[in-house]
Regions:
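Hydrophobic alpha-helical transmembrane segments
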Residues: 83-105
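Cytosolic-side transmembrane helix boundary signature
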Residues: 165-192
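Interfacial helix-loop-helix junctions of multi-pass membrane proteins
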Residues: 51-55, 132-156
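N-terminal signal-anchor transmembrane alpha helix
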Residues: 21-54
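Internal alpha-helical transmembrane segments of multi-pass membrane proteins
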Residues: 106-129
């Protein structure tokens, strides 16, 4: 038998074939990383949401409304909308990973884990900005609700939680266990840290679900208690008003927006009640009639009756006018809390309420396109309705 020379074997592997194989491996690793990072982000977002005053179910429903429009919105988030929101979020995170390691792989694929991490965090800023400022409210989705409903920092947190898993690519791109030992050590430690974080957030969420949140950490107990009581009462009236519109509004889109108001404010009140019981270990007292009358934007009984009794052809206009007044009052209250020395969780939640309710005023008045983006950016920075 004739022996084949080693040089002949090496020559049979052409440079073009080797490059193609590397590209395939890179794209496969990018897809694997996308699945890991998007799943990690979903888990962290779900477990952490309530700790900063977010109702995860409402947020997933809002995300589902990006591609599914009004179908996804209901007064109580449905499982189909929640799952659609999670699926759309994971698809988006998966796609950003493919861009980072696939499309841009010529520059990113061979980096060390720590270098990837240092680049991934600015990438999270870029990708979340692209979604919030352009891809969702403008081309290709033309859906202003997401940007007007959720302040930018929520998307930044979500994208950051995905980006922190990018260093695992430095191990995934090597086939057959050929990854350098330093990459293996780094990624082993990184995976351990990620699992520990999930366990910590899971335990915190479990205790929170049973009424044991991390303790109150504000500076003025009376001020924080007053804010929670007042905003809970204010939201309760907003829910009652929105429920009327969810049944009576002539414009189908306005009906759906009213349902979203019910869902978001109901979720906020659940969080307020959980925090109150956990922090202060007592039932939340009702607001007195004098307190209600003094709240900005709180409606009188006569105003509520006027909306209920409005003729069908006048209802939408009256509801938008009345709810805009009510929302403006909540914006003022939330803005005061944001600038106070209250518990950080209350302040973060207040910032989101200020943004959300100004955004809903804009949506009721038909904001869309670049005007919606401009309005959302201004709303994120301050009170623009009082």
């Amino acid at each position: 038998m004739n022996a084949v020379a080693p040089s002949a074997i090496s020559c049979s592997i052409r440079p073009g074939d080797e490059a193609a194989s590397r590209r395939r491996s890179r794209w496969i690793a990018a897809a694997q990383l996308g699945l890991i990072s998007s799943t990690f982000s979903t888990i962290v977002s779900q477990l952490f949401a309530a700790r900063i005053g977010r109702d995860a179910a409402v947020d997933w429903m809002t995300v589902a409304a990006i591609p599914a429009r009004d179908w996804a919105i209901s007064a109580e988030p449905s499982w189909s909308a929640i799952l659609a929101g999670i699926a759309f979020h994971q698809w988006a995170d998966f796609s950003w990973a493919l861009v980072f390691f696939g499309v841009l792989g010529r520059w990113t694929a061979d980096l060390r884990p720590l270098t990837i991490l240092l680049l991934a965090l600015p990438w999270a800023v870029f990708s979340s900005s692209m979604e919030w400022f352009m891809l969702v409210p403008l081309f290709p989705f033309w859906q202003p609700l997401f940007t007007l409903q959720q302040p930018y920092w929520i998307g930044l947190l979500v994208h950051s939680s995905s980006a922190v898993m990018y260093p695992l690519f430095a191990r995934l791109r090597w086939t057959g266990g050929a990854a350098p030992a330093r990459n293996v050590r780094f990624t082993n430690a990184w995976i351990t840290g990620a699992l520990a974080l999930i366990a910590l957030l899971g335990a915190t969420a479990l205790f929170g679900g049973h009424g044991y949140e991390p303790p109150w950490m504000g500076h003025d107990r009376d001020a924080d208690q007053t804010y929670i009581r007042h905003m809970t009462a204010h939201h309760a009236q907003g829910i009652a008003l929105a429920r009327i519109a969810a049944e009576r509004a002539q414009d189908p889109h306005l009906r759906k927006l009213a349902m979203l108001m019910v869902a978001s404010q109901t979720g906020a009140n659940r969080i307020f009640e959980t925090w109150w019981l956990s922090w202060f270990d007592t039932e939340m007292p009702d607001c007195s009639s004098d307190e209600r009358a003094a709240m900005p934007g709180f409606l009188t009984q006569a105003e509520m009756r006027q909306v209920k009794a409005a003729p069908a052809d006048q209802f939408d206009t009256l509801f938008v006018e009345t709810m805009s007044k009510h929302h403006a009052g909540a914006v003022r209250m939330a803005d005061q809390m944001w600038h106070s020395g209250g518990d950080l969780r209350l302040r973060v939640m207040a910032h989101a309420i200020r943004h959300e309710q100004q955004g809903e005023i804009a949506l009721m008045h038909g904001a869309s396109g670049i005007a919606a983006v401009t309005t959302a950016f201004r709303n994120m920075l301050g009170d623009n309705v009082n």
